[in-house]
Amino acid sequence: MTKKYINILKAFAFACCLSGTVSCQDDFLERTPDGKYTGESFYASDEAVLKACEPLYNRAWFNYNRRSMLGLGSLRANDGWNLYMNAEFARFQITALTGEIMQAWSSLHTVVTMSNAILHDVSENTGPDVSIEVKNQAIGEAYLMRGVAYFYMLRIWGPCILFENNDEVVLNPTRPLNPEEDVLKFVIRDFRRASEYLPEKGINGHASCYAAKALLAKALLAQSGWNKGGTRDEDILDECISLCEEVIDKSGASLIDYENLFKYQYNNNEETLLAMKWASPVTGSWGETNALLSDLSFSDVCDVNCWGGSWVASADMIELYNQELKDKKRLKATFFTYDTHYDYIKSASGGYTYDKKWIQVKKGVVGCKEDVDGQLAVMASPLNTYIIRLADVYLTHAEASLGNQARLSGGRGLECFNAIRTRAGIDPKTSITFEDIIRERRVEFCMEYCNWYDMVSWYRYRPDFMLDYFNHRQHRNAFIDNNNVEINPDGSIRYHFWWRDANENIYWSDALRDEDGNVVQSIADGYVFDLESLMRENGVDRITINESNVFAPYPEADVLQNPYLSMDPVPYDFGNDK
């Protein structure tokens, strides 16, 4: 038995143990599963079926959520970065041996294999007391989560290995890649099926059909322009818009206060359409809690062991906030800035006021034990991880409405765009462009582990535009250190690195200043903060993004055991689903 074969069996075993479809004996890996499931007795009741689906909301995602998604979804987008942790993601230096790449690959395939197992067992191995409503809920959830996993994989790796039958993979684990367009078609088919099976209101907090329709709209938006030469398919856009309006008008979801979105007390809030739901460290076990806590938090704001104090905003992100000086609600919820007060952190002592001249990451930081009813431990918080929330649907509508136009000047798409801005406390726009969409999405979802995925979809839609954006406008590889960030009287953020001119004056982003902070030359007097030139002059390597590194490498262990991962993809057999 090859190592690859054992790895496939391990993934299969883990998924099946989570869903309860097979016995979790230590000797499972010593033999090929014989296909005899215990599902008949396990799925004897509605409660048993729903219980079997619960790991699809946490355990199956654990290794992806643990650290991989931070690097893949946020650091590659240049939301922020950490010079000392996962910097290879921000620098586009990940390799086939990068641990987080292997964890993401394993975790996302676990979601797929577990979903496949549930689809099989709920269809074949349920007792007479299981209701059709619960069967449909479980089948819909399995399609939904499998679609989510493949949607992530598509935008991480490009071509993927599609499979629907776990037994076939066990018998033949060496399988070819399938092309991006087929993966996207598969994702859309899964979301469409999920929307047909899931109820309008999920049972006991499980997913509803509107979660599936929201994700279907998002996948269709990606498909509308994917490798289509810079244009979007209008028919696909029309369906996308229709789905968005259905979710907005009928789901019952609503936009809530932005800062509350990232407090554990507001888990499962009215804006949530689908999320990874993490257990309390008090009652949950390893694999069921949100392990990102210790990576993101630091000792000033957390009383459990943590090591995340060096996560900071990128210069690129700071400039996006400076474009809209009223955008303080989202800034406060996303990054700590000088003299900002948080009454819900260290709440027992009157709150916490950030006193550093820096810009550390705030999202994912929930405070101390006293702030979360004691539900905190090392690498363990109960804060949900959003997969999709209603704001995403609003901006999907806006982008689809813009479509192939250079500018959108009215209609419901513009209203949706402005609804997000109104919630943020900034002025509505009378018209929007593609660049407005990019800016709004990046700020709205900054440090929510998803911005890079939208950038990949945009890259497949408008590759030349996005390569220029990546390589000439994002100022990658420039780390802003402590004491190098200040707030101007008008609310804008100024920052600098350690670079000085011949007279020891410091190149700040808003002016040339002496060591005491006095302005030597202002922008009005001709000062230009040319960050790209300063980086080159001071030995900061340029990060070049192109077709060869937009997508991540496949894990080396899998490449060595599966030669197909080094070959061209082959079309997927969709059978009668043409």
Q: Residue ranges of each PLM-predicted region?
A:
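Conserved, well-structured interaction surfaces
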Residues: 45-64, 84-157, 173, 177-185, ...
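Short coil/turn linking the two alpha-helices of tandem helical-hairpin repeats
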Residues: 154-156, 161, 202, 222-231, ...
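Flexible, polar/acidic helix-loop-strand segments at domain edges
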Residues: 322-389, 571-578
